[in-house]
């Protein structure tokens, strides 16, 4: 049990690090260049269309990260987008925000460059 708790802390620290060390962090299935699910591809493509620099974390490479990010955010699905440490949401929310212009506003108000 003690080792499991320690492992959970290591996973939490790794997730924390990804979020804190990158202004925009996307926990996704696959990579930005080779997404492994349609939802991850959608969010990755939106970020690319906005020309936002982002860190893609492939949850398929680590089952504990895949499970841990869901607990970390209290959100049941992947992908998950974080901007400046704030959890934004999954595919549906990001897509709606993109279509309404709210996502671009969120980036600019957070000091993140986007395509004009």
Q: Can you describe what each PLM-predicted range is?
A:
Residues 83-115:
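Non-catalytic, surface beta->alpha helical segment in thiol-disulfide oxidoreductase systems
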Residues 11-13, 66:
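Eukaryotic intrinsically disordered and solvent-exposed regulatory patches
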Residues 27, 80-84:
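Acidic beta-strand-to-loop metal/phosphate-binding motif
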Residues 71-77:
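Thiol/disulfide oxidoreductase modules built on the thioredoxin-like
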Residues 16-53:
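Local sequence-structure signature of Cys/Sec-based thiol-disulfide redox active-site neighborhoods
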Residues 48-66:
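Thiol-based oxidoreductase modules, predominantly thioredoxin-like and allied folds used
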Residues 1-6:
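Short, Lys/Arg-enriched N-terminal segments with co-localized hydrophobic residues
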């Amino acid at each position: 049990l003690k080792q499991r708790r320690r492992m959970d802390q290591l996973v939490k620290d790794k997730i924390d690090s990804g979020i804190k060390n990158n202004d925009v962090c996307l926990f996704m299935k696959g990579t930005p260049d080779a997404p492994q699910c349609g939802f991850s591809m959608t969010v990755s493509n939106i970020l690319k269309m906005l020309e936002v620099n982002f860190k893609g974390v492939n949850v398929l490479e680590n089952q504990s990260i895949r499970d841990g990010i869901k607990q970390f955010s209290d959100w049941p699905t992947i992908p998950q987008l974080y901007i400046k440490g704030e959890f934004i949401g999954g595919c549906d929310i990001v897509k709606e925000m993109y279509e309404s212009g709210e996502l671009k506003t969120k980036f600019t108000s957070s000091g993140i460059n986007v395509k004009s």
